[in-house]
């Protein structure tokens, strides 16, 4: 599973294209949802901005295109993140970034923390269980293992960045 493919080979270009498409979908969905990155949950992505974030992503796609396990993991996680972004992007765009953030924060403040955390963990643990099952039952096959790993990675990312946003919101003074 740790085998690399030769840079410039057919397999390399397959994994490179897969990464470019999946990372591109993540970028597109993020741009539609939050063109000014007001709602971006990843502090590093927010700090890098669109220009540097795009450049670093292109470089990383070129590097990880030679490592199938990483390429499939990153690709799986990226398309799941893009799908999640697209789910609410229309609402974010129609309300505007600032108004959506204010609306979301108000909903959080009106919801009991235990209910919110239960729903978040319900969503992410159920998602991770699908990935975990793929990992567990995959045997020696690279593709289902990497897809399962990507699903678990997605669930962990959603949990981490959602809890990070929740922590920031709860420590900020109420307006």
Place the predicted regions along the sequence by residue.
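Charge-biased, low-complexity intrinsically disordered regions
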Residues: 1-175
């Amino acid at each position: 599973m740790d085998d690399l493919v030769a840079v410039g080979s057919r397999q390399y270009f397959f994994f490179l294209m897969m990464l470019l498409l999946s990372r591109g979908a993540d970028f597109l969905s993020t741009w539609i949802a939050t063109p000014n990155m007001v709602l971006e949950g990843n502090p590093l992505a927010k700090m890098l901005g669109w220009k540097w974030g795009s450049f670093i992503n292109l470089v990383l796609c070129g590097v990880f295109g030679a490592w199938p396990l990483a390429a499939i993991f990153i690709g799986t996680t990226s398309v799941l993140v893009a799908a999640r972004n697209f789910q609410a992007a229309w609402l974010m765009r129609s309300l505007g970034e600032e108004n959506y953030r204010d609306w979301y924060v108000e909903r959080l403040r009106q919801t009991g923390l235990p209910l919110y955390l239960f729903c978040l963990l319900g969503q992410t643990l159920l998602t991770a269980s699908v990935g975990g099952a793929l990992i567990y039952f995959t045997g020696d096959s690279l593709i289902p293992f990497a897809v399962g790993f990507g699903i678990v990675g997605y669930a962990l990312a959603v949990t981490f960045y959602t809890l990070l946003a929740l922590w920031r919101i709860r420590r900020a003074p109420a307006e």
